[in-house]
Amino acid sequence: MEINKAISNQNVIITLKGRLDTMTAPQLDDEAKSIDFDEVETVTLNLKDLEYISSSGLRVILALYKNLKSKGVNLKIVNVSNTIMELFSMTGMSDYLDIEQE
């Protein structure tokens, strides 16, 4: 998986490309832990080029959401494919995550 991070004003945009699974989920976790939350209002996950997400990937996104919420930082997930949106819906994550489909 490829992860790109860009910072614009008080927004961190993390773009994921490839597969978010057991092998690659720790990469996203490490990237999220490297963010200076004192300077950030919103973290945006751009999933436009994400092909697949496993339960490990969902777990990392849930942990990121909880961590950000405890710090008063918003998590926004954008460019979600129909397939990945189905997973968010089936797990109930779509009920509390700010998600925008493609």
Regions found by a protein language model. Name each.
Residues 61, 65:
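Histidine-anchored nucleotide/phosphate-binding helix
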